[in-house]
């Protein structure tokens, strides 16, 4: 029986949908992808007067997964509504609570493009899990009154929010053999919400529900220093709160050498729960809209293509296909396929075509 997956696509660079087409051709006896395209961010604001239309939200909630390009740019800096808020509405509508950002070298040769010395970064392999629904970004906010004298933001977390993302981390840790160690980052020496509450709930949840998982706690400032000088000490799962995760995951992008190499997933449930192996999620490359190079055909599509691999693994329960995509990307890089951001001359389209060609080679070799 052929499975049908509805996937909502908010366009960015098109490496992702192209790879999906090739996956469908390889698994045509097993799967069909129905791609529905919608606008998000500035493009949606120009067309509909809102960063995301209600129809797009409805389709996204009904879909198996969402594939997302980059949002925003200087053309909308003076828009009456921040166009980036469309992504926030999408995450809230889908209850996306756990952001996964793997930080590693898809091929060892890329250690030479890292911002860190090769002997420092070689072997780095982290999965940063960032809580998305709580913390200072969602707490009560008091803007200054125009005099620039005072303003405030409330950092607020509830037990259930921390517990849910800790369970996500524990579940993913237990999916490997041996279980992947977890390092939880906080500021427990000074702060209440993303400090002592966070540490206490994570400690209780992992020790009680995932006793075989090695857990350690680290202050966020210590983690930032460690990431810059000995990143392999953080190998495994790195679990942290919304704001700390926002900052530390961007810092971690210096390890592989380009934001364009990194994928991400924002999951709406814990894999292996009531939904079995499939969970709804939003998949997007880490890089922004890159307005300075947009339209030149030189954006690195690796992050988008690897985001498709994450979608295949977490939302579509196609782990073999996910591994095939990752292997194809690694093989293209090994053969010299590199975009400008990592020292090459390969265009966006050429890189995507080469990945598709490698996928076909893998099929023919079977």
Swiss-Prot record:
Record keyword Transmembrane present: no
Keyword Amino-acid biosynthesis (UniProt): yes
Biotech use: Due to their effectiveness as antifungal agents, echinocandin derivatives can be used for the treatment of human invasive candidiasis.
A GO molecular function held by the record: 3-isopropylmalate dehydrogenase activity
Site (Critical for catalysis): 137, 187
Protein origin, superkingdom: Eukaryota
Cofactor: Mg(2+); Mn(2+)
Entries under InterPro entries matching the protein: IsoCit/isopropylmalate_DH_CS, IsoPropMal-DH-like_dom, Isopropylmalate_DH
Record text on cofactor binding: Binds 1 Mg(2+) or Mn(2+) ion per subunit.
UniProt catalytic activity: (2R,3S)-3-isopropylmalate + NAD(+) = 4-methyl-2-oxopentanoate + CO2 + NADH
Alphabetized PANTHER family for the sequence: 3-ISOPROPYLMALATE DEHYDROGENASE
Stated role: Isopropyl malate dehydrogenase; part of the gene cluster that mediates the de novo generation of L-homotyrosine from acetyl-CoA and 4-hydroxyphenyl-pyruvate. L-homotyrosine is a building block of echinocandin B, a fungal lipidated cyclic hexapeptide that acts as an antifungal agent. This is followed by isomerization of 2-(4-hydroxy-benzyl)-malate to 3-(4-hydroxybenzyl)-malate by htyD.
Assembly and oligomerization: Homodimer.
Protein name, as recorded: Isopropyl malate dehydrogenase htyC
């Amino acid at each position: 029986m052929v499975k049908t997956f509805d996937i909502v696509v908010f366009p960015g660079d098109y490496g992702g949908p192209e790879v999906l087409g090739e996956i469908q051709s390889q698994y045509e006896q097993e799967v069909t992808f129905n791609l529905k395209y919608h606008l998000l961010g500035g493009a949606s604001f120009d067309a509909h007067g809102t960063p995301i239309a209600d129809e797009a939200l409805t389709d996204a909630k009904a879909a198996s997964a969402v594939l997302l390009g980059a949002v925003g740019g200087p053309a909308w800096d003076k828009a009456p509504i921040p166009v980036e808020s469309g992504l926030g509405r999408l995450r809230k509508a889908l209850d996306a609570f756990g952001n996964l950002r793997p930080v590693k070298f898809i091929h060892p040769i890329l250690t030479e493009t890292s911002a860190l010395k090769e002997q420092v970064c070689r072997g780095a392999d982290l999965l940063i899990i960032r809580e998305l629904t709580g913390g200072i970004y969602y707490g009560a906010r008091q803007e200054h009154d125009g005099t620039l004298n005072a303003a405030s933001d409330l950092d607020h977390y509830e037990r259930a929010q921390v517990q849910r993302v800790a369970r996500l981390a524990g579940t993913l840790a237990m999916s490997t053999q041996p279980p992947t160690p977890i390092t939880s980052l906080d500021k427990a020496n000074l702060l209440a919400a993303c400090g002592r509450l966070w540490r206490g709930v994570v400690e209780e949840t992992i020790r009680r529900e995932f006793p075989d998982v090695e857990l350690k706690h680290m202050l966020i400032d210590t983690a930032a220093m460690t990431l810059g000088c000995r990143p392999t000490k953080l190998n495994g799962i790195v679990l942290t709160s919304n704001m700390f995760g926002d900052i530390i995951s961007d810092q971690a992008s210096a390890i592989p050498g380009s934001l364009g190499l990194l994928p991400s997933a924002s999951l709406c449930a814990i894999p292996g729960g009531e939904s079995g192996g499939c969970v709804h999620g939003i998949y997007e490359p880490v890089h922004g809209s890159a307005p300075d190079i947009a339209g030149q055909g030189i954006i690195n599509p690796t992050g988008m293509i690897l985001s498709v691999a994450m979608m295949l693994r977490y939302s579509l329960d196609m782990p073999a296909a996910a591994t095939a995509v990752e292997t194809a990307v690694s093989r293209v890089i090994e053969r010299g396929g590199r975009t400008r951001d990592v020292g090459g001359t390969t265009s966006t389209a050429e890189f995507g075509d080469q990945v598709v060609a490698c996928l076909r080679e893998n099929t023919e070799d079977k």
